[in-house]
């Protein structure tokens, strides 16, 4: 038989709906299984005003329970005819008396046991408690009590519709009784009786409620597209579409307009006002320029001039505020804002944003020299100085436009006559803001972005603010990933150790370090290494290749990536496979030996002498290849040793009876192994 359960309530926040339905479904399925009630499937529907659950083919009876619980052995359960603690524990666990115990025999001996048989009950007798529990156990990010009730829910509950096989499942929670009645749209529907799931689905639609979330979303998308002229497009992102879908029971799209005067303000400001503050969809032309139009999705079934005018009025007030803040900000020089950063706390132990900017300037100056951008030093340091200036602007500071940090800084900088690269760098130093985001394109934004992130990362580690499990209040994992991705994208030749050290120097000058400097350095570098592993893994490189390279040296990200690429390309070659076989064999013989003392007078065979001469020649060649960053050539040089090493193993017994000869041969192989491991631990490759 089919089951229908609807929790009717005052409108809950849109962000609560999907999780509430997911929890309702999983909890119901769990309870049916725990109660031995078979069912075919469970599906959910939802609007801000109702959570709906439908279950198909729910069995009319519980299954009988016939189980045997085996406890400890008879020997452990009894001593001198009396129960031991083990025996008493078995009784307690099963809530039974000693008389209910049986002794059973199996291949392992005699054991105490308890046989239980429970006759299944009618499902309709069990469902009331199950449905009550579903309501009482439903949790939300925030919940409330109302009236004199003790129950907590996202919003006050108004009704329960509960049917099983067409009959009402009777239950009550603090005066709210279940029934066969539901309610339609708050303004365009009425109360109605329900006799079945099919009947409910028909009547709920007749009462202007679209309970299927995916159907509502599709309707909204179609309505938006149908509202556009040929040369227009709407700014529709998934998050806003999902939110609006969960704000209405029946969508209807209305096109509104606003004064063209507001287009003087950067369109990103207007778009934020519409999307974030009002949940409207902005309309743009095909080139991406904002038009003085928007789409609002009303919770209704038809056009309303009053709704249109009301939304236009609200938006105009919003945009007027934004325009006022914008022009007020243009009156204030950005340098003045830098001074105001002294009043904004970055982190309680690390000082203000102003302190942070000063540290970033020192890091940036180091990077300018290291990366040989001295000819752009003035613009780069100017970018770093102004990077956070917009945080204290009217537009950003407590004015609900925080998403525009960086963008507004760029705009104000351009209006103030700053260099284009400086302005762009102010915006781009925040890139990437999330996974898959843009990366800074100019060196100003690249250096400002790295300086900002390494100061945050090292600073937080330096005062003991370190991510643990799911807790990462300063988003340090994302910060470290940003450093790694910026360096890779810009192909920067830089030592992470040097970068961390210069950041530590700046923190020490500010006298804010609370943790041992050496420990901070080690911990930060390990943290960065793990992020490098993550990024390389996302790039689809083999884990063993990544670790072979990074366990050898993770200090220079671009160098490490180049080596990973070369090894990956070489792995498909027969020469590389032959080299790896030799590496494994040499590694097994060495067994961790580090001594490379070699005495030529102890060579007893010509092949030992030949291998030594060839390896000395290859050593100088591979060192030159590494110096020139020709890593493919490095491996080509190693390949030349393989035939000689193979011949060596065919004719030489390394474990000679003479200890001096044996040690000399192991030393020679250790020397060769060092050649193999100059840029990666090849013996770690599968």
Curated annotation (Swiss-Prot):
What family does this belong to? Belongs to the class-II aminoacyl-tRNA synthetase family.
The record's subcellular location field reads: Cytoplasm
EC number(s) given by UniProt: 6.1.1.14
List the lineage, top down. Answer: Bacteria, Fusobacteriati, Fusobacteriota, Fusobacteriia, Fusobacteriales
> Hey, what's the signal peptide range on this chain?
none
Listed under GO biological process in this entry are: arginyl-tRNA aminoacylation; glycyl-tRNA aminoacylation
Q: Which GO terms describe its molecular function?
A: arginine-tRNA ligase activity; ATP binding; glycine-tRNA ligase activity
Q: Which HAMAP family match?
A: Gly_tRNA_synth_beta
Q: What is this protein called?
A: Glycine--tRNA ligase beta subunit
Q: Name one GO cellular component term.
A: cytosol
